[in-house]
Amino acid sequence: LAPLKTVVPYTILVDRQSGYAETIKGLAPGALTQDNAIAQAAIVQYVIARETFDASDLRANYEKTALWSDGPTRAAYRHLFQKGNPDSPLTRYPATTIVSTTVKSVTMPRTGSATVRFDTIRHDQGAAGGERRSWTAVIDYRFSGAPMRMEDRFVNPLGFQVTHYRRDAEDTAPTPVQFDSALGVPTR
């Protein structure tokens, strides 16, 4: 006799700070389509470029984010960096501050939409510690076949464009982070 029930194991990852739970799926051949893989890679690159602050590559990240944004999303992003905007990273952070971004997960509930969970870690030059914030971004995107300059095509070969971007904090206060003094990286 064969058993009537089949046990299917699942691995569930629970975020210690926010309590957010997600099912972890192993890699299986054919589980991720090429289109989804390309979309996820573009989404991750976009979030990292948009949320990272580092004076050494600020211009490249700004140009990439503006190029990869469309319509109101591009206008809102450009407004964020205008002089006199109190919410601008240029106003909030000194030039020696580095905010690094690490993407934790990308969920794509439907074509053209993604939810991205990520952390930002702020480190001020010379400080032994910093702060970690956890975020969730809801993104709508598309691939546009609109003509673009050749140098822009090198940065965005498939015409990836974010049409909506909303970022919300997962936690109410930043978590303190200590840095390894020799390496300048967060200790776990």
Feature annotation, model-predicted:
Residues 1-10, 16-37, 41, 51, ...:
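Structured, amphipathic secondary-structure segments that form assembly/contact surfaces
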